[in-house]
Amino acid sequence: MNLKVVYFGTPTFAATVLQDLLHHKIQITAVVTRVDKPQKRSAQLIPSPVKTIALTHGLPLLQPSKASDPQFIEELRAFNADVFIVVAYGAILRQIVLDIPRYGCYNLHAGLLPAYRGAAPIQRCIMEGATESGNTVIRMDAGMDTGDMANITRVPIGPDMTSGELADALASQGAEVLIKTLQQIESGQLQLVSQDAALATIAPKLSKEEGQVPWDKPAKEAYAHIRGVTPAPGAWTLFSFSEKAPKRLMIRKASLLAEAGRYGAPGTVVVTDRQELAIACSEGAICLHEVQVEGKGSTNSKSFLNGYPAKKLKIVFTLNN
């Protein structure tokens, strides 16, 4: 393949795709990623996963503070690229950038467009109980994930799959569908299909507060919520012990309690036959296998109950109206 490609991407998902493209000898002439960010607990700047891959392979690297910067745009033009590939870059590209490559800009979107347009298609589809996801390659336009579709691949969502696991599955097949698209571009056989705007839904970025588990919903829905926000932004609930001020409890691993039925009012603390912590929902309950009290390390729920006996434990949450 003779197409010259400039690759835009930032997180681990994009790094996996870039690594696979390089493995298949795609001609990556330059890489664009976001500027290094400081660690949460220190001022040390951390490179993006995509930057790490680019440096490992000795690829030309651009890290503009703004994608609209005139100098950056001139540097992009100098690469004389045939195609820009964009995978979770993390910033909006204006039309002046989209117009640079000979054959246009193509985005790998981790969702089945036109559903789940936006920053969090992986998390949102699991939270809403979807049983299938996939990758959609679109030719980018000025809208948010509104471009014409080039190719789609599909991935089933298992009943216990988390958003992290789905991201890994989608990333592992991302290069394949991009290579197919590049081959079609080079051969002149690419066929684009317009999105049906009537079927479009939005998947905005998740806030940390959206990680709170809705215990007042049926267990299946609450479990889908937990899976969707795992590992990020993270599932959590508030608990109080011996009537003290509530603390945040992060839920790292969970599962549906096998025995269906009612376990009391939503939020009721249940101790399973295996001496694990479970929480009642409006129907059924969810077993918590690994938890983390704010400010402490992760532990299994048996150890948690040793420190916080169930009789003095209360789950605090806001009802969803």
UniProtKB/Swiss-Prot annotation:
Highest taxon, organism lineage: Bacteria
InterPro entries, A to Z: Fmt, Formyl_trans_C, Formyl_transf_N, Formyl_transf_N_sf, Formyl_transferase-like_C_sf, GART_AS, Met-tRNA-FMT_C, Met-tRNA-FMT_N
Cross-referenced Pfam families: Formyl_trans_C, Formyl_trans_N
Known catalytic reactions: L-methionyl-tRNA(fMet) + (6R)-10-formyltetrahydrofolate = N-formyl-L-methionyl-tRNA(fMet) + (6S)-5,6,7,8-tetrahydrofolate + H(+)
Gene name of the record: fmt
NCBIfam families: fmt
Enzyme Commission code: 2.1.2.9
Name of the protein described by the UniProt record: Methionyl-tRNA formyltransferase
One of the record's GO molecular function terms: methionyl-tRNA formyltransferase activity
Organism: Chlamydia pneumoniae
Top EC category: transferase
Binding site for (6S)-5,6,7,8-tetrahydrofolate: 111-114
Family membership noted in the UniProt record: Belongs to the Fmt family.
HAMAP family xrefs: Formyl_trans
Function: Attaches a formyl group to the free amino group of methionyl-tRNA(fMet). The formyl group appears to play a dual role in the initiator identity of N-formylmethionyl-tRNA by promoting its recognition by IF2 and preventing the misappropriation of this tRNA by the elongation apparatus.
Assigned keywords, A-Z: Protein biosynthesis, Transferase
GO cellular component entries: cytosol
